């Protein structure tokens, strides 16, 4: 017998989902879609938007004494090339780009180049096929160009150095070494912050697309909550969110859909897996749909019960604590925006909130708990063509500058019940709870772009 074939008696089959359950779920999700605000699914950022971005980046480069800047993207770090090249349809192969006085030039392998050419024309970007960016060890019958030719084409001639606009943590070391072979180690200059600052400030068109993505995020989350019940797999719940997102016009996601039940809450950001959701489980859910590459996000924690009253008093306590923390964080963000305060005020307010609840929590669990240290991460971060990988704009206790003028911010308030390791249980029976929304700021005005209720428990199985 082949080692690849098992006898039928050894095959463990998952229980079939009754057709009636599928029909009920479909009816629930279709109702969510029918009630969704209208979105123009075919709307894309126009050429003028990309030309203005290129102008702003070139102006920043020139002020810093650089003739050309280098950017890089792949399926995971998707933003830096599409921001200038319009190629939001990244697929499999990595791509790079060079911005200079002659505009934006994309460098890609054969297949990645075809993919880029599908959309790059709308940005006025020129696509070049180069071997250094082709897929792994495959060979392609193309007349490839050299990367140095692409650089000269963008810069308008030979240059003596190039500015790295993408973080070195993202660009493959081999590409950095190749650039150093062209310009020397001192000729590859870190200039990432100037690009960060350009991308940080959003245009009205970007805010429109992010607002559309926020509508989709709400509907995806509402769909998943509607079908969430004990006995479902995490992936089954996530599947309905994915379907709703694509039906409403999201072509990609800032991260894989999150559905984590029971111990999976300890991942904080883990994706849905083929794991059953049990009666009374904590479940964290998260979505980050993109419209024309621009991202919105919403995350919530709920309990898998068929009636909100069946959540335990203990579960309601932790949920209330985090939800109140979110309200404190949003109020502080609005104050920072309205008064032009240093952004750190908002993060300090969150830290102080959790520290102020520490004695209460310590008494509840019967031991001293440093609650502020269980706030797992910075509560507020920048977003755009990635959900949380902008490398700039997160609000920390070191953020002395005020907020930008027109920006998008993810307000992510959470609490964990574990320490530095998976089994380092600090609060028994509680692993993680989160509330995250997408905020838009324009001048002193702040709007929560995602409209799902902060307390989402009543939406579980609600449709």
Task: List PLM regions with ranges.
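Active-site neighborhoods and metal-handling regions in enzymes and metal-associated proteins
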Residues: 1-463
